[in-house]
Amino acid sequence: MLSLAKIAALFVLTAVAEIVGCYLPWLVLKAGKPVWLLAPAALSLALFAWLLTLHPAAAARTYAAYGGVYIAVALAWLRIVDGVPLSRWDAAGAALALAGMSVIALQPRG
């Protein structure tokens, strides 16, 4: 069984792989960046799919819990990569999503 820290790191890595895999095509289509960026985007999305298989819970439960982490990582990306300041509403929404994720991910298994 993976430790809580390893599961959290796996969720974050999974989210980054998904965001990169979607952000690069966005750059190609919306910002006129070179089309070769689609190759690393495809690799990143393949990595994302593979990382999802490493999570210890049932697939649907993993996807549900992952959603909360994805929201927090996407907001961090918005701030760090896109340079957009976050609002208190962003922070509150991420906190609520992470709380919901925690309820799903940390439920007793039996």
Swiss-Prot record:
Domain of life where this protein originates: Bacteria
Topological category with respect to the lipid bilayer: Multi-pass membrane protein
Compartments reported by the entry: Cell inner membrane
Annotated InterPro entries: UPF0060
Transmembrane segments: 9-29, 34-54, 64-84, 86-106
Main location, first listed in the record: membrane
Pfam families assigned: UPF0060 (PF02694)
GO cellular component, as recorded: plasma membrane
Keywords of this entry: Cell inner membrane, Cell membrane, Membrane, Transmembrane, Transmembrane helix
Family stated for the protein in its record: Belongs to the UPF0060 family.
Protein name: UPF0060 membrane protein BTH_I2792
Organism per entry: Burkholderia thailandensis (strain ATCC 700388 / DSM 13276 / CCUG 48851 / CIP 106301 / E264)
